[in-house]
Amino acid sequence: QRRTSDGPTTFASLDAQELPVVREYSAGGLIFDDQNRVAIIARHSRSGHLEWCLPKGHIEKGETPQQTAVREVHEETGILGEVIDSIATIDYWFTGTTQRVHKLVHHYALRQTGGELTVEGDPDHEAEDAIWVRFDDLDDVLSYPNERKIAWLYARKKNRQANE
């Protein structure tokens, strides 16, 4: 005889395709100082690992992606900046315990206009540390392949502009 479960169905037991979809929009990017270094942050991933990444965060109501990039860079690194270029948008999916998330992250190049490197101003306390990294060393330091690609795309864009 076949046994059936009398308990409620939990989201964990559902196929991921059946989970509700949530869309998230974020912005951030590469913030450069006058020595061509980029400020990056360390934060804990969903699995608890410390990972080095670009500063970024959710777009708030009434904000443009550029305004979000400036705000998030300042909150997570202490560095004030201005957007100088658009780089690319990362589009990806991930599955949580109760939903599938479709996330778009807009990345910009920013130039430092002030501030000091610190994580003390991060209202969400997500950033554990912040450091300056030479732009050419980002590929060795950034944890996420998509963010390494952002740096590569910006380097390629700058090289093209220099050769025009």
Residue ranges and their predicted role:
Residues 50-54, 128-131, 152:
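A short, polar/proline- and glycine-enriched secondary-structure boundary/capping micro-motif
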Residues 140-164:
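Charged phosphate-binding loop/patch that engages nucleotide di/tri-phosphates or the phosphate backbone
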Residues 24, 54, 85, 102-105:
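Short connector loops at helix/strand junctions that flank enzyme active sites
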Residues 59-82, 90-146:
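Unchanged
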Residues 6, 87-88:
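Local beta-strand/beta-hairpin segments that build beta-sheet-rich folds
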Residues 1-28:
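Acidic, metal-coordinating catalytic segment for phosphate/diphosphate chemistry
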Residues 28, 37, 129:
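Conserved beta-strand and immediately adjacent loop positions that scaffold enzyme active sites
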Residues 33-75, 79:
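Conserved Nudix-box catalytic region and its N-terminal flanking loop in Nudix hydrolases
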